[in-house]
Amino acid sequence: MPLSYQHFRRLLLLDDEAGPLEEELPRLADEGLNRRVAEDLNLGNLNVSIPWTHKVGNFTGFYSSTVPVFNPHWETPSFPNIHLHQDIIKKCEQFVGPLTVNEKRRLQLIMPARFYPKVTKYLPLDKGIKPYYPEHLVNHYFQTRHYLHTLWKAGILYKRETTHSASFCGSPYSWEQDLQHGAESIHQQSSGILSRPPVGSSLQSKHRKSRLGLQSQQGHLARRQQGWSWSIRAGTHPTARRPFGVEPSGSGHTTHRASKSASCLYQSPDRKATYPSVSTFERHSSSGRAVELHNFPPNSARSQSERPIFPCWWLQFRNSKPCSDYCLSLIVNLLEDWGPCDEYGEHHIRIPRTPARVTGGVFLVDKNPHNTAESRLVVDFSQFSRGNYRVSWPKFAVPNLQSLTNLLSSNLSWLSLDVSAGFYHLPLHPAAMPHLLVGSSGVSRYVARLSSNSRNNNNQYGTMQNLHDSCSRQLYVSLMLLYQNFGWKLHLYSHPIVLGFRKIPMGVGLSPFLLAQFTSAICSVVRRAFPHCLAFSYMDDVVLGAKSVQHLESLFTAVTNFLLSLGIHLNPNKTKRWGYSLHFMGYVIGCYGSLPQEHIIQKIKECFRKVPVNRPIDWKVCQRIVGLLGFAAPFTQCGYPALMPLYACIQFKQAFTFSPTYKAFLCKQYLNLYPVARQRPGLCQVFADATPTGWGLGMGHQRMRGTFSAPLPIHTAELLAACFARSRSGANILGTDNSVVLSRKYTSFPWLLGCAANWILRGTSFVYVPSALNPADDPSRGRLGLSRPLLCLPFRPTTGRTSLYADSPSVPSHLPDRVHFASPLHVAWRPP
């Protein structure tokens, strides 16, 4: 007969009708009983022949991939002009006085941040924008390209101009070595930037002065026209200098970009004055030390003999006859002036050698499940987290639930601040740019994917043998719709581009660490400036607490002004005032303790409504179920031990079948949630100890002892002794010398015992007492006559490593690999 829910509940001692604890509880450690219960609940039948269920509610497992949804009307979010002040340490010291060593160290980490992976793998530009939406390839291309352009204009990305130079918008930092600011700075840096002339090329040095003179005379116009070149050679100057060295086409460092001035062959008359008709010719040195731009008259023998000029793919359609009703020339002829082929930033800097490649792909998704109108850029830099050369990201303190409750459970009024684009506040050193490259190969290659009869014969430059091979109805309709949104920018976005991150990207494991260090240091400064208030952060989520609403408002004003003075951008529309119940990290934290937020409780209820009974569920689905239930497990009677059968099926990669009793048990557990309370400081006066054959308690002057009917593993015996001490004394602070009991993780014990002990010891705090000083040591060995001196050990609630102050442990030195010993604990859950 299957085990009923009521019988199972009585077995776990969850009802008041249970017998004496000293008799009932040791039975739950019996392996035979645990095996019989597992068989009755059908928990151990891992090998089933019935087909697995691969979907439960919104949880999907194997063979049921969710198709991403593309929104053609996504709005690209706007980014403010984010510029974190370089003298942030000085500004903080003006605000609060001298900084602590830890605050200063954390702020120095991000001024600027550095990223040097062991190995960087470069991918072709074709893989710059991932074909995440095969049905919307062109639309997704232009939307992503527009997002990248927005980031560049906001100063978040560098734009690669040549192998050794990049341009960007916004305010420069001191470590961004300026490349061009008029003739003077070019002359100062010319010795280090221009290529070393070969023997006998005195003509180059002879003409250097005239080039500089030309630059200074033409001023801004010349700098803009030739802004991405390092040496500027006027088209009228004859030259006898041979090329310094053409980089081999197979080396992977050739720039695939349509030249800017080539576009002027198809520009309107008024634009010809602005963009003179001079063909450009780009060369890379094989040594990587020099990149020069040489200008020659369009018909010169030199320019034709070296390399054919590839004009702008987009503007070529202007002078071609329409091939059909859906020819792209019809779109190109809609506008007389399509603007330049390229744009340049306000500043040009020198960068390490950067190939015309990408190191990660990008694609767009919804900003979040609640905001599908705006898009979010996903950057895949997972190459740095995989393989033999993966980077070990630094670890940082994250508060667990009990630490968070100890810190924030109070009678304060709360509000939370929203930091706009938190990651994009932290600047990266330009030396990291070659490792964090994104970009695109130009729309012509994407067009080639759509067209079945297209022939992409010239792989090196991405141009087509026949221009009109790319024309199709699908492409025409897509571009006409995009023209409504982007207008002349369609031309700009159709060109290849390589961009590197100037601020830390979200797709690298280093970024969360740096953001956590930054916000924790800022909150530490705020706490010291306002000692009667509380400021706390996790990543970009910052909360402020004060004793009254009026006090909180004045604190909010002062802190907001301070953060704005540092260059930190806040979103005032998303500032939330919580009253006395703070919503933070998925919890509701009040003076009573912590509980899960309401939307998580609703998800759990929905999950139990959808979970089928007596049907094997794919272990991938079980992973997702356990992820949801595990978040709320500390608020239930039996906690994590109740989920151990599910953990076992995931570990063995087998299906799991919910029996009616086990489902009812879990359902009741999660329908009645108990808050996790704040730990209070106090004195420990109740002690427990055990041997494999007996247990002993010390409660003030009173001593108690007992024996087990059969010898038990020492950790199990110690856990039983702690349960007896809690049950008999009612004390919520216990002293023990067992590290496993101290850890309060009961998933390593026999399943039934772990569930029962979690409920008995819920809300109990433990203090470590050495065996030599433990008053319960003698009773556990059967000696009641001896009396040790009375102990009163102080208990102080822990906040983990997340201290309210910036005094964190110093950076540890590199230790050798830790030796792993076999654990003496029993395996938590073994299927019968």
Curated annotation (Swiss-Prot):
Swiss-Prot/TrEMBL keywords: DNA replication, DNA-binding, DNA-directed DNA polymerase, Endonuclease, Host-virus interaction, Hydrolase, Inhibition of host innate immune response by virus, Inhibition of host RLR pathway by virus, Magnesium, Metal-binding, Multifunctional enzyme, Nuclease, Nucleotidyltransferase, RNA-directed DNA polymerase, Transferase, Viral immunoevasion
S-S bridge residues: none
Protein name, as recorded: Protein P
Listed EC numbers: 2.7.7.7, 2.7.7.49, 3.1.26.4
GO MF term set: DNA binding; DNA-directed DNA polymerase activity; metal ion binding; RNA-directed DNA polymerase activity; RNA-DNA hybrid ribonuclease activity
Sequence segments annotated as region (Polymerase/reverse transcriptase domain (RT)): 336-679
Site residues (Priming of reverse-transcription by covalently linking the first nucleotide of the (-)DNA), renumbered to this chain: Y63
Location of region: Spacer: 178-335
Function: Multifunctional enzyme that converts the viral RNA genome into dsDNA in viral cytoplasmic capsids. This enzyme displays a DNA polymerase activity that can copy either DNA or RNA templates, and a ribonuclease H (RNase H) activity that cleaves the RNA strand of RNA-DNA heteroduplexes in a partially processive 3'- to 5'-endonucleasic mode. Neo-synthesized pregenomic RNA (pgRNA) are encapsidated together with the P protein, and reverse-transcribed inside the nucleocapsid.
PROSITE patterns hit by this protein: RT_POL
Record's signal peptide: none
Sequence segments annotated as region (Terminal protein domain (TP)): 1-177
Domain Reverse transcriptase, first and last residues per copy: 346-589
Catalysed reaction, written as an equation: DNA(n) + a 2'-deoxyribonucleoside 5'-triphosphate = DNA(n+1) + diphosphate; Endonucleolytic cleavage to 5'-phosphomonoester
Region annotation Disordered: where it falls in the sequence: 186-218, 239-266
Any single biological process term in GO: DNA replication
Domain notes per entry: Terminal protein domain (TP) is hepadnavirus-specific. Spacer domain is highly variable and separates the TP and RT domains. Polymerase/reverse-transcriptase domain (RT) and ribonuclease H domain (RH) are similar to retrovirus reverse transcriptase/RNase H.
Tagged with keyword DNA-binding: yes
Organism: Hepatitis B virus genotype D subtype ayw (isolate Italy/CI/1992)
Regulation: Activated by host HSP70 and HSP40 in vitro to be able to bind the epsilon loop of the pgRNA. Because deletion of the RNase H region renders the protein partly chaperone-independent, the chaperones may be needed indirectly to relieve occlusion of the RNA-binding site by this domain. Inhibited by several reverse-transcriptase inhibitors: Lamivudine, Adefovir and Entecavir.
